[in-house]
From Swiss-Prot:
Amino-acid positions noted as binding Mg(2+) 2 in the UniProt annotation, renumbered to this chain: E27, H141
Required cofactor(s): Mg(2+); Mn(2+); Zn(2+)
Protein's name according to its UniProt entry: Riboflavin biosynthesis protein RibBA
Keyword Hydrolase: yes
Cofactor stoichiometry and binding remark: Binds 2 divalent metal cations per subunit. Magnesium or manganese.
Site residues, Essential for DHBP synthase activity: H124, E162
One GO-annotated biological process of the protein: riboflavin biosynthetic process
Pathway assigned in UniProt: Cofactor biosynthesis; riboflavin biosynthesis; 2-hydroxy-3-oxobutyl phosphate from D-ribulose 5-phosphate: step 1/1; Cofactor biosynthesis; riboflavin biosynthesis; 5-amino-6-(D-ribitylamino)uracil from GTP: step 1/4
A molecular function GO annotation: GTP binding
Region (GTP cyclohydrolase II): 200-397
Organism classification: Bacteria, Bacillati, Bacillota, Bacilli, Bacillales
Catalysed reactions, as listed in the record: D-ribulose 5-phosphate = (2S)-2-hydroxy-3-oxobutyl phosphate + formate + H(+); GTP + 4 H2O = 2,5-diamino-6-hydroxy-4-(5-phosphoribosylamino)-pyrimidine + formate + 2 phosphate + 3 H(+)
Region (DHBP synthase): 1-199
Amino acid sequence: MFHRIEEALEDLKQGKVVIVCDDENRENEGDFIALAEYITPETINFMITHGRGLVCVPITEEYAERLQLEPMVSHNTDSHHTAFTVSIDHVSTTTGISAHERATTIQELLNPASKGSDFNRPGHIFPLIAKEGGVLRRAGHTEAAVDLAKLCGAEPAGVICEIINEDGTMARVPDLLECAKQFDIKMITIEDLIAYRRHHETLVTREVEITLPTDFGTFHAIGYSNSLDMKEHIALVKGDISTGEPVLVRVHSECLTGDVFGSCRCDCGPQLHAALAQIEREGKGVLLYMRQEGRGIGLLNKLRAYKLQEEGLDTVEANEKLGFPADLRDYGIGAQILKDLGLQSLRLLTNNPRKIAGLQGYDLEVTERVPLQMPTKEENKTYLQTKASKLGHLLNL
């Protein structure tokens, strides 16, 4: 149904337009997107004729600062916080509204010699400031346009226009597919663009390394930062893991209540300790401690989920009641850390098949699943049964 990101990039490099859809739980819209560097009056005319929406120009903060483009409003109450600047027309234009003059304004916006005084305010082109980090920080069309431009090696600016049906309603995916077919346009999703960037870009940085003596043995501890969500993670490495043989690995998601306070609601603390002990016994391996509290929903939301469980919901139902998926974790950052450690082939300590699939999706080979089942307690029996029945965990209960 959708095209690959690589296909869209090739068309954009040729000055063509693509359609980009966002999530159905967000705006659930599609936009025409083109590279600002290659914009022509013909492309503008196509957008306003067949898109019928507002023509905007996503740019970086640097463009806005250089051209002194102030925010359109001092207090942004838009539900998605779209960062409109004041609208502009280039001083060489007349009314500024024609396709030709809108293209001129966009071309001059990209001109490195242009100054803020070269543009009249307000005008008919609406610059939008993309967030630093692009779609990895905000999954909007603004960020998608700038990301696509960067991936094409072009100036970091795009031209976008919402697609509206002839009857005035917003075009949804079935309508957008018809539009793409009619005009032979590639169609991609922001979700796929996020996945593409996560797969192709290095988002982790090795920050510090120390020797860490523990009750289970002495480990080489390596601290990592990441540019995706700014969370900090730590890898505990034992022995020589550079032999090329499959390495015993545990990817452990942070659980403050279980790991630190010894909560009996889950089996996280015992799993953490058992994994460290097993790696120590083998003489080599990695425990990767990921800051993904509560399967990614955070500490306070996990406590809220616990409250709902006290009222009768199970762990999956509680997450969903709070508006979260059953499991919000993404293994891309963890996979990048494991690759930074030089690993390609793993023996994974886990009961969770989704974790195996998540890591394999980033080109890591899992040669063996090593079970890590802890004794069941009365307090976590229902929790473990739900993980087995609803999340697919491989447990003998």
